[in-house]
Amino acid sequence: MTQDGTWVDESDWQLDDSEIAESGAAPVVAVVGRPNVGKSTLVNRILGRREAVVQDIPGVTRDRVCYDALWTGRRFVVQDTGGWEPNAKGLQRLVAEQASVAMRTADAVILVVDAGVGATAADEAAARILLRSGKPVFLAANKVDSEKGESDAAALWSLGLGEPHAISAMHGRGVADLLDGVLAALPEVGESASASGGPRRVALVGKPNVGKSSLLNKLAGDQRSVVHEAAGTTVDPVDSLIELGGDVWRFVDTAGLRRKVGQASGHEFYASVRTHAAIDSAEVAIVLIDASQPLTEQDLRVISMVIEAGRALVLAYNKWDLVDEDRRELLQREIDRELVQVRWAQRVNISAKTGRAVHKLVPAMEDALASWDTRIATGPLNTWLTEVTAATPPPVRGGKQPRILFATQATARPPTFVLFTTGFLEAGYRRFLERRLRETFGFDGSPIRVNVRVREKRAGKRR
């Protein structure tokens, strides 16, 4: 640590740990309703930020989507859902099933109804199901912005759910009173709370239709995310608490990344932005790659995103069962060649569809996170540095050979090292040092960073 302390600041990752330790214990509030009644707008209003994908097209939200929320000092989880229709078909039927699961598993439910449209057959069907659930149910009469809207809201008493809360999710009207009522009915701890403490956060990322939702469903053992043959059927990050190998993991299943965020349109653009945020909020990322197809620029870009974010990395080659035996050995060599810069990444060949080798993902994540958490004491680190630089000194630059005076590990998560030198170190030499660090200390599955601080010349002392 230097005198000004600029290189040693562990407060960020310690705060991360405390936030993670709190997850899983909060009660859950599900927000349900027909398509395009304003559920995601209400969720964003509750959160005080844009998290849920919102667009003026019915059915933009297709999954149950969980977000951590805070209101008047009380923690809870708000669960956005796809539009609920009792007689839906195809993909919309799958979405309706997700909303039905949310109704059953939440600690309280907010049913959102468009006050201007009035109670529809779908609203009445939802009300009947909710009344049978025995859960606290709150009726939110949305899009109330006038006296006529107040009258429209009052007409929703007919649903039998008690007094309608007249709100405008768009403008915030009435939302505070609604939340006060909801929180008063919530238990201190959710029924489905995890008792194992803070789960490690995992982001599932990859290009569209590579099998992220299928993998999540295989791990969870239920139809947790909407899976359909159309590419990109998951458009929001979906948090799932899943017990694997005796530990609870928090999976974030993200929308498939488009070729370029700037080229995506509508809700696909917003979903791409949320994918970036999912990687940032995770500790380890599983990058799914289609083993039956050549590695693409999209695949490489996703891997780069994870490395740039400094997250532990597992490469999961999905659809391995579709690769011929004769092709597999050749494919392994191709992977080594194309991903030469990330040979340190954990690699697992799986089939999300059949479950082949999926169990190997947990030890791969555990190893990657152990490397990500690693701290090397200053003594052994500088002993290693002395031996390496004696055998291979830094290259001469501008007629002078820089010396490395001292090294320290500034932070973990990812492991970040600072070298104090008398001159600039070439990028190639820094990569050499990174390779030697990995050979000696491991770090399999984790990016590491090597930063250089050039010692400033001190002014001569006054006599």
UniProtKB/Swiss-Prot annotation:
GO terms for molecular function: ATP hydrolysis activity; GTP binding; ribosome binding. It holds the Pfam family MMR_HSR1. GTP 1 binds at residues 33-40, 80-84, 142-145. GTP 2 binds at residues 206-213, 253-257, 318-321. Residues 374-456 form the KH-like domain. It comes from the Bacteria. One of its GO terms (biological process) is ribosome biogenesis. Associates with the 50S ribosomal subunit. Belongs to the TRAFAC class TrmE-Era-EngA-EngB-Septin-like GTPase superfamily. EngA (Der) GTPase family. GTPase that plays an essential role in the late steps of ribosome biogenesis. PANTHER family: GTPASE DER. NCBIfam families: GTPase_EngA (TIGR03594), PRK03003.1 (NF002828), small_GTP (TIGR00231). This is GTPase Der. It comes from Mycobacterium tuberculosis (strain ATCC 25618 / H37Rv). The gene is der.
